[in-house]
């Protein structure tokens, strides 16, 4: 087994109406409670970062899966929506829905349509974030081929 450490430091002062900082090798972002939840809404927030992590992991995994399946001249634009709920005073991410729009050469469109379901599952199974949240967060994939 090989382990990889991803180190992020966070800073916060005072109460809930403040702005903190999340910093890693590349990320250097202000963090706060979203304004939609009564916070100051500056920078990003853990909910958005969770959806961004799931989305970026899935799109990278999907691109690699399509490449290994010999679909080389593609582009993917994806929207991902995280749906959270408040139940008994506790917030929980219920679902993350990925909607990849895959552009492929016309000559490969039919072949991709035939193999797409299997390739989507392979990509999801190879995504570390999907593997980490599966069982706690429902992951939906609604693809479009352009």
Task: Describe the predicted segments one by one.
Residues 1-52, 60-146:
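Extended beta-strand/beta-hairpin segments
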């Amino acid at each position: 087994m090989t382990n990889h450490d991803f180190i992020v430091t966070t800073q916060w002062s005072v109460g809930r109406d403040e702005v903190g900082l999340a910093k890693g090798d590349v990320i250097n972002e202000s963090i706060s409670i979203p304004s939609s939840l009564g916070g100051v809404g500056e920078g990003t927030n853990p909910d958005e970062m969770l959806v961004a992590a799931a989305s970026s992991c899935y799109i990278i995994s999907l691109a690699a899966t399509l490449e290994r399946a010999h679909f080389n001249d593609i582009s993917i634009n994806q929207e991902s929506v995280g749906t959270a709920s408040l139940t008994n005073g506790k917030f929980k991410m219920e679902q993350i829905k990925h909607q990849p729009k895959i552009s492929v050469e016309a000559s490969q469109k039919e072949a991709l349509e035939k193999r797409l379901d299997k390739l989507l599952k392979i990509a999801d199974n190879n995504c570390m974030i999907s593997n980490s949240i599966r069982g706690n967060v429902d992951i939906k994939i609604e693809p479009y081929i352009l």
